[in-house]
C-alpha cells in the first residue's frame, strides 16, 4: 500500500495521528512478490464497468477484504494468502482505484458496498461473509453488515475510521490550542492539487506533487510491483477516485455509517487499534497519548455494538497494522471465523502476543 504524505484525512483532524511503523525498518528481502499485483486479477462486470476482484482459496464463510483510502488489493498481501489456506478470500480495488474502472458516482461507503456486493454476486462468491476493513474500509464494512445483515457473520476492523472522528478531532484540537497556543498557528502542508497535477494523464515523476499525491510504498514490496503500483496511483483515474473518497469521507460516508444499526447482536466484531506511538516533534507525549485514547474510545464504541465485540490494542504498530503486524490481523480473522462457526464462544479481551 502507499502512504500519502499529504492526506485529506490528516488535514481535517484524523485522530489516528501515528507514524507507520513500517517506515522504521525494511525487511532483508521482499515479502510481497506475487505477480498478481502487476495487473488485474479478474475484471468483473457490474453493469457497464468492471471491478478488479482478487479471489483465492476455498471454504466458507468467505472472507472479504476492503482496503483503506486510496489503497488496493495489495493492502492485504501479507494477510490474504494465510486466510486463503482454509477459506475463500476476496480483495478488490474500489471504483477508479488500482485496476478497476472509474465510476460516475461519488466515492462513498454506500456506493462502494453496492459495487462489491454486485461483484460478489456476479463472481458467484456466495455468503456467508466475514468482512475485514482497514482504515476507511472499516466504515464501509459496517455499512455492508448493516445492509446485508443476513449475509454477514462477523467483522474485523483494522484501525478503522469512524464517522465521528472529525467532530471529535475538532473538539480535541480546540482544547489542545488552549493548552498549547502554538498549535493553533502550526503550519499545514499545502494542498498539492493532485487531480490538477495529473491532468496530462498521470502525475509526472519530477512533479513536486508526485510524492505527496502518490505516497510511499511499504519497503517489503518487490520493486517491479512497487513501480507498477506507483504508475497506477499516479494516473488521473486514481487521483480523481481518491479525491472523491476524500471529499465524501467526513460528510456523505460518515452520515451513511452513522445511519447504520448500533446493535449487531452476538456477531463477532474484533477491532484492532494501534498502540500509542512516540509524539511528533513539537507535541508533548501526554498530548499524543490523549489523542490515541480518543481513537481507542471510538473503536471501543464499535466493539460495544456486539456482545462478542472486543478491541485489541496492537503494540509495535502504526496505522498500517496489516503491514506492521499481519500476524495479529490473521489471528483476529481466524478467531472471528471460529466464533462465527461455533468453534469458539467469546473473543479474547486482549491479544497474548506482545
Describe the function of each predicted region.
Residues 307-354:
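Catalytic active-site module of serine/aspartate enzymes centered on a nucleophile-bearing elbow/loop
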Residues 30-50:
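N-terminal cap/lid segment of alpha/beta-hydrolase-fold proteins
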Residues 46-99:
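Conserved HGGG/HGGXW glycine-rich cap/lid loop of the alpha/beta-hydrolase fold
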Residues 10-18:
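Bacterial N-terminal signal peptides
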Residues 127-170:
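Conserved hydrolase catalytic core segment
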Residues 94-132, 148, 174:
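Active-site loop/oxyanion-hole signature of alpha/beta-hydrolase fold enzymes
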Residues 171-301:
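Alpha/beta-hydrolase
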Residues 1-9:
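Bacterial N-terminal signal peptides that target proteins for export
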Amino acid at each position: 500500500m502507499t502512504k500519502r504524505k499529504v492526506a485529506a484525512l490528516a488535514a481535517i483532524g484524523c485522530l489516528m495521528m501515528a507514524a507507520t511503523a513500517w517506515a522504521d525498518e525494511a525487511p532483508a528481502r521482499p515479502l510481497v512478490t506475487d505477480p498478481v499485483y502487476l495487473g488485474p486479477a479478474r475484471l468483473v462486470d457490474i453493469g457497464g464497468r468492471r471491478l478488479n476482484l482478487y479471489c483465492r482459496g476455498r471454504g466458507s464463510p468467505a472472507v472479504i477484504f476492503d482496503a483503506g483510502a486510496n489503497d488496493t488489493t495489495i493492502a492485504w498481501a501479507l494477510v490474504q494468502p494465510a486466510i486463503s489456506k482454509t477459506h475463500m478470500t476476496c480483495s478488490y480495488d474500489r471504483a477508479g482505484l488500482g485496476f478497476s474502472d472509474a465510476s460516475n458516482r461519488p466515492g462513498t461507503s454506500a456506493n462502494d458496498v453496492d459495487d462489491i456486493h454486485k461483484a460478489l454476486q456476479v463472481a458467484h462468491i456466495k455468503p456467508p461473509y466475514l468482512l475485514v476493513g482497514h482504515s476507511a474500509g472499516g466504515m464501509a464494512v459496517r455499512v455492508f453488515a448493516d445492509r446485508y445483515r443476513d449475509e454477514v457473520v462477523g467483522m474485523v476492523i483494522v484501525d478503522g475510521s469512524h464517522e465521528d472522528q472529525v467532530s471529535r478531532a475538532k473538539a480535541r484540537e480546540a482544547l489542545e490550542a488552549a493548552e498549547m497556543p502554538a498549535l493553533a498557528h502550526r503550519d499545514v502542508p499545502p494542498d498539492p492539487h493532485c487531480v490538477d497535477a495529473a491532468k496530462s494523464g498521470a502525475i509526472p515523476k519530477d512533479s513536486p506533487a508526485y510524492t505527496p499525491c502518490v505516497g510511499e510504498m511499504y519497503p517489503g514490496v518487490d520493486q517491479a510491483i512497487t513501480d507498477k503500483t506507483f504508475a497506477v496511483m499516479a494516473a488521473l483515474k486514481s487521483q480523481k477516485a481518491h479525491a472523491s473518497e476524500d471529499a465524501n469521507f467526513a460528510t456523505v460516508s460518515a452520515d451513511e455509517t452513522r445511519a447504520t444499526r448500533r446493535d449487531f447482536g452476538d456477531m463477532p466484531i474484533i477491532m484492532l487499534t494501534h498502540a500509542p506511538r512516540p509524539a511528533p516533534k513539537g507535541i508533548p507525549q501526554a498530548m499524543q497519548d490523549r489523542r490515541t485514547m480518543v481513537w481507542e474510545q471510538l473503536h471501543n464504541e464499535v466493539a460495544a455494538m456486539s456482545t462478542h465485540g472486543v478491541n485489541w490494542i496492537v503494540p509495535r504498530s502504526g496505522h498500517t497494522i496489516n503491514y506492521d503486524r499481519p500476524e495479529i490481523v490473521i489471528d483476529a480473522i481466524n478467531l472471528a471465523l471460529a466464533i462465527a462457526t461455533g468453534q469458539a464462544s467469546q473473543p479474547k479481551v486482549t491479544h497474548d502476543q506482545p
